[in-house]
Amino acid sequence: MDGVLIIDKPEGITSHDVVQAIRKKFGISKVGHLGTLDPMATGVLPVAVGKATRIAQFIPNAPKEYEGEIRFGFATNTYDRSGTPTSAERPIEGNLQEAMEALTGTLDQIPPPFSAKKIGGAPAYKLARRNRAVKMAATRVEVREFAMAGFDPPLMTFRVVCSPGTYIRSLAHDLGQRLGCGAHLTSLRRTRSGEFQIAQAVALNRVSTSDLIPVDRLLEPMPRIEVSEKDEIKVRHGNQIRTAEDAPFARIFNKQGEFLAVAAVENGWVRPRVVLTSITSHLRDRQGCILEKEIES
């Protein structure tokens, strides 16, 4: 079982809970999510299964899209509705549209103190829960779009298109700071993560093997190189072969269309970075025999 499942994460569970549920349902250990969603958030959560976990590092870090709701009037210590208020109720002071425009573009964003960001090797949220002072370093992010969808004071619905690593909770908090009234996130739904759309997402309790996106399709922007039988053996062993391709990375296939490896391309050489099948399985299929020693990538 290899590929990616696009899960519509329900509210109230962690991204790790989703991973554990898939491990239990399908009886497979190699499972990992591609981009964390907070427990309060719902929506698109890509989950790599089997061999897909090995090539996740090569999946393009593409923009993400969200829809959500912000409550103006006071801030919370978690920057969302799960937290404790940190300020008294105050009215909006300033122009909302101008404040949103100021939070669009390239930003040095400070993550929430209740986040998985590491401080001295420990997740920030663990320190924050002990009431220890948490000084978060700013992270460079890009907010391509921050648009109002509706406004019924004190609530505003919005849409955001942003780079991976952007904290929408921080965006809500910073907007409240600019308006002098405080604000926090009350709901969030991820509608797109890279090429994965909410229309593709499947409820966790309904997901099946038929929902798997094949491993090779995840890397379709990469060039495809088809190799001879002789070069196939070299690739399965992790050895380099010659090529005329000049892209940084390529997908390697054999003559039968089997996805063999992801490789770096350097100075006319294809150097396998992740080999997806062992030489043993190839020889077993070809000769009907089992080698005593399996050669893995």
What are these regions (language model features)?
Residues M1-P10, T14-L37, A41-V44, M100, ...:
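Accessory RNA 3′-end/elbow-binding domains used by RNA modification enzymes
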Residues P123, P154-A199:
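Pseudouridine synthase
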